[in-house]
UniProtKB/Swiss-Prot annotation:
The keyword rRNA-binding does not apply. It is found in: Cell membrane. It comes from Methanocaldococcus jannaschii (strain ATCC 43067 / DSM 2661 / JAL-1 / JCM 10045 / NBRC 100440). Keywords: Cell membrane, Membrane, Transmembrane, Transmembrane helix. This is Uncharacterized protein MJ0953. It holds the Pfam family MNHE.
Length: 100
């Protein structure tokens, strides 16, 4: 089950990075940048899983984790434009499969 989680995680992460890269380029050209900070509560219980989630969000263009509160499973994420929780953490269920 963990191997499937790793494969799914990598596939979704690569897709998210590519889509976000295109989005950031478009927004940079059009000047449609409206930064904000969003607080996300994670479904991941494992501290290492939370760190991987934080890294994954930061590796995705247009997003940056600025704070991680592991005891509350919360992350504060800076984004260049308003977006849904699902758009920020599409790989979260796969990380949960790996670590929980």
């Amino acid at each position: 089950m963990r191997l499937l989680g790793v494969i799914g995680y990598l596939a979704v992460l690569i897709k998210a990075i590519c889509e976000s890269w295109v989005d950031v380029v478009k927004r940079s050209i059009n000047g449609e940048i409206h930064p904000q900070v969003i607080e996300i509560e994670s479904i991941i219980n494992n501290p290492t899983g939370l760190v991987l989630l934080s890294w994954s969000i930061t590796a995705t263009p247009g997003t940056l984790v600025i704070d991680l509160i592991p005891e509350e499973r919360k992350l504060k994420v800076a984004v260049i434009s308003p977006r849904s929780r699902e758009d920020i953490v599409p790989f979260e269920p796969y990380i949960k499969k790996i670590f929980d």
